[in-house]
Structures are given as structure tokens and as C-alpha cells.
């Protein structure tokens, strides 16, 4: 596994564990020589992860639409910055470059990227592993909702395996590498 796309919040959230564990994930990326592919911002958990990887001599590729350069405050210190025209192009490029996906805590944008990636896996557009970094049980309510959707007959039980989950950065990467 060479590259992992990470979806993450453009804010750091209100619990110190979000940033602390994101930094630890960055160290694990660098230690395992896995390149980060992400949205290209220097703010929030996106920036925390990129900075951690760069501080440990890892590689980071940011992908951002031109019109978001000011709003998301583009990270100009990344190894490679790819400028695209639209959010659709950003997501397509991130997916094209990635061998796997991780979702860190985040808001609507993170949820949208996560669910689009899961939907693509469900219909066979890709077979790349996907995992949630469940810091402070951030994603536990979402996992419960997914289980509820399975019980209600809206998601096939076999598709539950499309989303892995871990609370430890090394275990998270180990699971993805094993699946990839």
C-alpha cells in the first residue's frame, strides 16, 4: 500500500484527542512510508495530519479546487499540491491516486466523501479498503446507524464489511494494508 486518501475535518473539533490521535496517525503514515492524499488544507485535522507526516519526513499530496484556496487556506508546504477546477475533480483525483481510504472525524464534507466512497464500493466502482479512525468513539453513532439500516433492510448485511473501524493508528493501518 503506497497511498491512502484521508477525509478529515477542516476544523480540529473540540476534544484534544482528535488532534493528538491525528498526529499519531501521521507518525504511523511516515513510519510505514505511506503517502497521504487529502484535500490540501492546512487547517483543522487535515492540517494536523499533513504537518505530522511532513515533520516525520513523509510524503503528502494535497488536491484542492482553485476557488477553495482562500476559504480552506491551502497548505503550501505539502510535497505536491494539485490544483483542480471543481470538487468533483478533487474527489475523482483523490480516488484515482489512493490505494485505500480513511475517514477521520469531520463534518458534512467528510461525511459526503465517506458515503460517496462507500457507495462506489457497494456498486463495484472500486474495491479499495475503507476504514474509520474512531477517535473518542466519534463514529460509533454512525456505525450504529449503519447497523440499523442493515436491520431495516436498506443495506445488505454483506456490505457491512465495506467499512472497517479502529481506534488505534497502527491497528488502523495494519488492517488496511492487510485488506489492500
Model-derived features: positions:
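A cross-family phosphate/adenosyl-ligand binding-site feature
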Residues: 1-97, 135-180
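Arginine/glycine-rich "motif VI" loop of SF2 helicases in the C-terminal RecA-like domain
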Residues: 54, 121-128, 154-155
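Active-site/ligand-binding-proximal alpha/beta "capping" segment
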Residues: 91-123, 131
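Short, positively charged, low-complexity/disordered linker segments
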Residues: 123-141
Amino acid at each position: 500500500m503506497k497511498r491512502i486518501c484521508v477525509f478529515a475535518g477542516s476544523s480540529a473539533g473540540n476534544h484534544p484527542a482528535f488532534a493528538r490521535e491525528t498526529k499519531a496517525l501521521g507518525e504511523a503514515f511516515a513510519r510505514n512510508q505511506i503517502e497521504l492524499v487529502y484535500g490540501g488544507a492546512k487547517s483543522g485535522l487535515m492540517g494536523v495530519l499533513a504537518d505530522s507526516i511532513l515533520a516525520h519526513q513523509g510524503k503528502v499530496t494535497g488536491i484542492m479546487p482553485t476557488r477553495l484556496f482562500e476559504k480552506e487556506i491551502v497548505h503550501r508546504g505539502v510535497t505536491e499540491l494539485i490544483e483542480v477546477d471543481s470538487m468533483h475533480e478533487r474527489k475523482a483525483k483523490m480516488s484515482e491516486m489512493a490505494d485505500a481510504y480513511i475517514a477521520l472525524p469531520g463534518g458534512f464534507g467528510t461525511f459526503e466523501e465517506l458515503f460517496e466512497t462507500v457507495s462506489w464500493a457497494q456498486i463495484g466502482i472500486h474495491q479499495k479498503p475503507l476504514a474509520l479512525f474512531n477517535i473518542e468513539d466519534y463514529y460509533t453513532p454512525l456505525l450504529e446507524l449503519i447497523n440499523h439500516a442493515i436491520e431495516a433492510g436498506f443495506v445488505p448485511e454483506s456490505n457491512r464489511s465495506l467499512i472497517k473501524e479502529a481506534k488505534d493508528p497502527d491497528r488502523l493501518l495494519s488492517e488496511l494494508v492487510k485488506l489492500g
